[in-house]
């Protein structure tokens, strides 16, 4: 019998949640995802120094203003890392829009277009890129605009069912519901551990997946933010799962039969009318965990973006 990672690949598209090329080469995922925290981590690896130098050189041709140079360097660095990753995978790279734009639809759209142009100028076509946006109302509306322009989006920091519904109704390409961070909140709140089958994050993704399939939504469900392989195994059969290298290693070492837990019902239930802005805000607000985790996630990504900018500024 093959290991559980090999079995999982037959049920689910496996994505690597890392910006580290060596890990991607080792596990050969279909796609890869990055975020500001992973870009910051990757930028501190010696082999990436030339990518930083090239990004700085590019930025200096774009502006004489140091603050603008920092912004342009960070954007080009994310694209440079994405380009390197794309050399080793057959599918798509997810590159994230600055988290500080999470509540600004117009600037999110502009930043997304800029990142895509950088990829396009390097010979990378749109069908190999996903633009990551936080699943705020503004982020979802930005994605709706971008999707109509042929720019596929990955809506991240998704914690509530309201966020999931709004994303499907906006026709976004893919969502990344966070499993582990949901579990973290309930573990802290209730002071107990959860069996994988009862894990609140697992239950959240299962509910979203089943709702999408029952109503015929095409939006891809990609579970993210895992704390252990138990959560991953309970979501076998999900459209995609983005997994950190350490957990990919555990899956590769695990033996035993793996069965699909999520199965596409291919339903055709009538869809409800799309949520209004006020309905979205109210439904999301009713989920205390989601309110806290969305805000925290945006803040934390913004902190790491700031650290990356400080690192770049010191090199200019």
UniProtKB/Swiss-Prot annotation:
Stored Gene3D superfamilies: Aldolase class I (3.20.20.70)
Annotated GO biological process: carbohydrate metabolic process; pentose-phosphate shunt
Cystine bridges: none
GO cellular component: cytosol
Active site residues per record: 132
EC category name: transferase
Protein name: Transaldolase
The organism's taxonomic lineage, starting at the top: Bacteria, Pseudomonadati, Pseudomonadota, Gammaproteobacteria, Vibrionales
């Amino acid at each position: 019998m093959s290991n559980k990672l090999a079995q999982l690949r037959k049920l689910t598209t496996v994505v690597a949640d890392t910006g580290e090329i060596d890990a991607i080469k080792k596990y050969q995922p279909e796609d890869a995802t990055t975020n500001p925290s992973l870009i910051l981590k990757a930028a501190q690896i010696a082999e990436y120094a030339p990518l930083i130098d090239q990004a700085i050189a590019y930025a200096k041709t774009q502006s004489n203003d140091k603050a603008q140079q920092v912004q342009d360097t960070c954007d080009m660095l994310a694209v440079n890392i994405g380009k390197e990753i794309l050399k080793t995978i057959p599918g798509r790279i997810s590159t994230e829009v600055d988290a500080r734009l999470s509540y600004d639809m117009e600037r999110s759209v502009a930043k997304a277009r800029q990142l895509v142009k950088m990829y396009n100028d390097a010979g990378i076509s749109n069908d190999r890129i996903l633009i990551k946006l936080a699943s705020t109302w503004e982020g979802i509306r930005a994605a709706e605009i971008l999707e109509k322009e042929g720019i596929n989006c990955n809506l991240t920091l998704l914690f509530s069912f309201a966020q999931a519904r709004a994303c499907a109704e906006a026709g976004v390409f893919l969502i990344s519901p966070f499993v582990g961070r949901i579990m973290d909140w309930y573990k802290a709140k209730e002071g107990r551990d959860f069996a994988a089958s009862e894990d609140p994050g697992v239950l959240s993704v299962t509910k979203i997946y089943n709702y999408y399939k029952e109503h015929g939504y095409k939006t891809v469900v990609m579970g993210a933010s895992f704390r252990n392989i138990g959560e991953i195994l309970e979501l076998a059969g999900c459209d995609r799962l983005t997994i950190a290298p350490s957990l990919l290693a555990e899956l590769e070492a695990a033996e035993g039969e793996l069965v699909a837990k999520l199965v596409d019902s291919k339903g055709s239930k009538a869809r409800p009318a799309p949520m209004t802005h006020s309905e979205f805000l109210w439904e999301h607000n009713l989920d205390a965990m989601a309110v806290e985790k969305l805000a925290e996630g945006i803040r934390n990504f913004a902190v790491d973006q700031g650290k990356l900018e400080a690192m770049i500024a010191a090199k200019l």
